[in-house]
């Protein structure tokens, strides 16, 4: 008991991260600015130009802090351009730079914790751990032995203040948190940045990095309690529930039946040996070898944890209990399923031979065509029926740029969905993008598609050869004659760290 408490105190002592002085360092905003120009996967190019000044950002921060302590409301208006002026400059642009700089600052303590976690340990390189594709070999290895899955849509916080309160537990820097809270409350636009779309959690494109950090940290906080209980499950019988309540005492000190009533039953749930949890953004999977009764207990536990300790309202329809043998999982752009594959084995015993029919479980991954068509429709590459359309906004570009953009999109999609067991859906996407490219070029040159393709020849097709096709022929040269068997192979990559968003590709 005492040893366990000391471990908690040690963890707590490492969380006094004072980041307030970094907010006034110019190199922080230069780093955020460079990330924007380099079109980082987390931070889009927000339209900076040579007129932006780090000195103005620093002065604006000082001015805002003065206004904060004098309780003078300095409101950023989204409509009145005259109100958005500071020293003759647009405060809207510089407020975005402040948020992006703040995102860089608050990430530093957690990045240092990651480095200390990986230091001195024989682990896979961190960039390999970040790959989305690394989860599918894990599925293939584990899912065939499991029975039930909880398909979870994680609820969203009802107010931005909850996100700040969660961050307060790790960053014991009151000045930084006051400044953050001041930004969130005084800028009306930020209050409407978090929206709910079809029971999922989404952010507006502006300052996405900062709010994604707050939300992911909020989710990781509840996950840390989940993992904490899981890892200590074999020692819990000698530990009182108050120990666990200390970790979240900054929310509310209450005695909830989640930890106090029928505590032995809760411990039994955590001691389930075949239990796996995965999450990406606002969707999570909890897979177990147990029964439906056990999964219902997990559902009850998660709902109570979200609602009573993290003030995240959860509805029953956000958590579904499914049997793996009868259900396909829609996760990370793939339809994953476990199906029975018949297997015939011939057995020979002296003079007699007979056939034994067995059924083995096989993990399959397929690319769903309907969501991909919807993404192409949203990006205006085709209509709702899947018929290719021209891209008028790209007609002003050069021919090589147009072809490169279409080819780049398809190469990204083909690269990401290389793990699909069947490639017919990719062929259809390739057809749509190729014909959309031809329509765009024909529109630019004021010609028909037939005449343009006749003049261009097969040159257009060469841009749509993917790296995956080259990898297939280099990896499996002997199978080049049997294309059907060749394209049923799956390849998982360790350099994919995000899902491509066609709608935002401009």
From Swiss-Prot:
It comes from the Eukaryota. GO terms for biological process: mRNA processing; RNA splicing; tRNA processing. The keyword Kinase does not apply. GO terms for cellular component: chloroplast. It is found in: Plastid, Chloroplast. The keyword RNA-binding applies. Disulfide bonds: none annotated. Its main location: plastid. Keywords: Chloroplast, mRNA processing, Plastid, RNA-binding, tRNA processing. Pfam families: Intron_maturas2, MatK_N. GO terms for molecular function: RNA binding. Usually encoded in the trnK tRNA gene intron. Probably assists in splicing its own and other chloroplast group II introns. Belongs to the intron maturase 2 family. MatK subfamily. This is Maturase K. It comes from Empetrum nigrum (Black crowberry). The gene is matK.
């Amino acid at each position: 008991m005492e040893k366990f408490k000391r471990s908690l105190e040690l963890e707590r002592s490492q969380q006094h991260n004072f980041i307030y002085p970094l907010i006034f360092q110019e190199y922080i905003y230069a780093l955020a600015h460079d990330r924007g120009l380099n079109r980082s996967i987390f931070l889009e190019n927000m339209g900076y130009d040579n007129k932006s000044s780090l000195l103005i950002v620093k002065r604006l921060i000082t001015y805002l802090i003065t206004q904060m302590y004098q309780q003078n409301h300095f409101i950023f208006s989204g409509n009145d351009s005259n109100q958005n002026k500071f020293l003759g400059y647009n405060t809207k642009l510089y407020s975005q730079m402040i948020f992006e700089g703040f995102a860089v600052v608050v990430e530093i303590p957690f990045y240092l914790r990651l480095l200390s976690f990986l230091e001195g340990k024989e682990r896979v390189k961190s960039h390999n751990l970040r790959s989305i594709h690394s989860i599918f070999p894990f599925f293939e290895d584990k899912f065939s032995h499991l029975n039930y899955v909880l398909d979870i849509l994680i609820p969203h916080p009802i107010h931005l203040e909850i996100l700040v309160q969660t961050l307060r537990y790790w960053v014991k820097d009151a000045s930084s948190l006051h400044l953050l809270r001041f930004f969130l409350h005084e800028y009306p636009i930020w209050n409407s940045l978090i929206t709910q779309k079809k029971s999922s959690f989404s952010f507006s494109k502006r300052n996405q990095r900062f709010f994604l950090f707050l939300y992911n940290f909020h989710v990781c906080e509840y996950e840390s309690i989940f993992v904490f209980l899981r890892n200590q499950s074999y020692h819990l019988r000698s530990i009182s529930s108050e120990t666990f309540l200390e970790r979240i005492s900054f929310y509310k000190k209450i005695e909830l039946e989640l930890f106090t009533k029928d505590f032995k039953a809760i411990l039994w749930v955590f001691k389930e040996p075949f239990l796996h949890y995965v999450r990406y953004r606002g969707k999570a999977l909890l897979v177990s070898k147990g029964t439906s009764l056990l999964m219902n207990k997990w559902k009850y536990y998660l709902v109570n944890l979200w609602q009573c300790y993290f003030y995240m309202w959860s509805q029953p329809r956000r958590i579904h209990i499914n049997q793996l043998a009868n259900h396909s999982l829609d996760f990370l752009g793939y339809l994953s399923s476990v199906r029975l594959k018949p297997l015939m084995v011939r057995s020979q015993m002296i003079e007699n031979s007979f056939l034994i029919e067995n059924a083995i479980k096989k993990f399959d991954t397929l690319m769903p065509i309907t969501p991909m068509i919807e993404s192409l429709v949203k990006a205006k590459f085709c209509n709702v029926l899947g018929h290719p359309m021209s891209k008028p906004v790209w007609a002003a570009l050069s021919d090589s740029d147009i072809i490169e953009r279409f080819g780049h999109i398809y190469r990204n999609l083909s690269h990401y969905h290389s793990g699909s067991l069947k490639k017919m859906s990719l062929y259809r996407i390739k057809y749509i993008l190729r014909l959309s490219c031809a329509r765009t070029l024909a529109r630019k040159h004021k010609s028909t598609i037939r005449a343009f393709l006749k003049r261009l020849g097969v040159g257009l097709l060469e841009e749509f050869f993917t790296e995956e096709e080259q990898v297939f022929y280099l990896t499996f040269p002997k199978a080049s004659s049997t294309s059907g068997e060749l394209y049923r192979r799956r390849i998982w990559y360790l350099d994919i760290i995000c899902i491509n968003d066609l709608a935002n590709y401009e």
